[in-house]
């Protein structure tokens, strides 16, 4: 039984009461973890989540169809086997059978899902964010910031949201998915050393550690930046100009296919020498003939094969990039239309 004795505002309790109060206090001090289900559900209801998923689905469907062209393209770029598309095709079939055309496709499918999800999702998100920022800053364009005798207007209207979004998309997807690109190239170029994904991962790790999965990251970023920027910029500008000239609000599926293919062709042609140098750097380590940097790789190609050596495999690349770019946009827009139409329902 507790005895309460008032003394200068204090409450005195016996041992039993203290023990009981301590027990109650202990119960009340149990850790309470926040409920993350609501923000997770909100995310999967968001436009961004649906755009990321649309990109993943579009990439997977496109890659499954075009894997043989990717195999031939990679072999020609790195200088393996025949110098012609038909010759390279027959060489692969004779040595490895028809399944050789899908060499590395396992890793291709694993790679393309996060790559396209991150790339297309990032492009859409950054484009909207940049456009919104420009609209907000336009309202205060007349305002000037003065620092001593120097004054300037905080305007960013001269910056293209599409170009920034394209560059951001390429950088983000490359940083996250580069190890998968390394694995794909090893499986494609040296199937005798890396016959499967399960063997390639431990062999690369034993030889070079974690750094082995990021071999050639610098050159990859250098090559990806102009390609990604040009690709998204060209597609968006062609789409906008075409819709304006035809007084249309949106492209039809065949029009997406054509404009996507043209954007891929333009971007690939501009950035192809950097792609050749990047592939030589990445695969050169396997032969013990790795140039020290991208400039050295380009110089080596020009010295051995002439300037046209920088475009070796360009035809195969266009044969792969053009349909890939066009089909990807068709699938992406189709999935986006489907998923955004049910915007009130969570994806999971």
UniProtKB/Swiss-Prot annotation:
The Solcar repeat ranges on this chain: 46-129, 157-241, 251-338
Tell me the membrane topology, using the record's own terms. Answer: Multi-pass membrane protein
Predominantly, its location class is mitochondrion
Q: Which InterPro entries match?
A: Mit_carrier, Mitochondrial_sb/sol_carrier, Mt_carrier_dom_sf
Q: Which Gene3D superfamilies match?
A: Mitochondrial carrier domain
Gene Ontology CC: one annotated term? mitochondrial inner membrane
Concerning Pfam families, the annotation shows: Mito_carr (PF00153)
Q: Which residues cross the membrane?
A: 52-72, 104-124, 156-176, 213-233, 256-276, 321-341
Q: Which GO terms describe its biological process?
A: transmembrane transport
Q: Where in the cell does this protein reside?
A: Mitochondrion inner membrane
What are the UniProt keywords, alphabetically? Membrane, Mitochondrion, Mitochondrion inner membrane, Repeat, Transmembrane, Transmembrane helix, Transport
Q: Is Cell membrane found in the keyword set?
A: no
Please give the PROSITE patterns that the UniProt record associates with this protein. Answer: SOLCAR (PS50920)
Domain of life, per the record? Eukaryota
Protein family? Belongs to the mitochondrial carrier (TC 2.A.29) family.
Purpose of the protein: Probable mitochondrial adenylate carrier that catalyzes the transport of ATP, ADP and AMP.
Question: How is this protein named in the record?
Answer: Probable mitochondrial adenine nucleotide transporter BTL1
- Highest classification ranks of the organism: Eukaryota, Viridiplantae, Streptophyta, Embryophyta, Tracheophyta
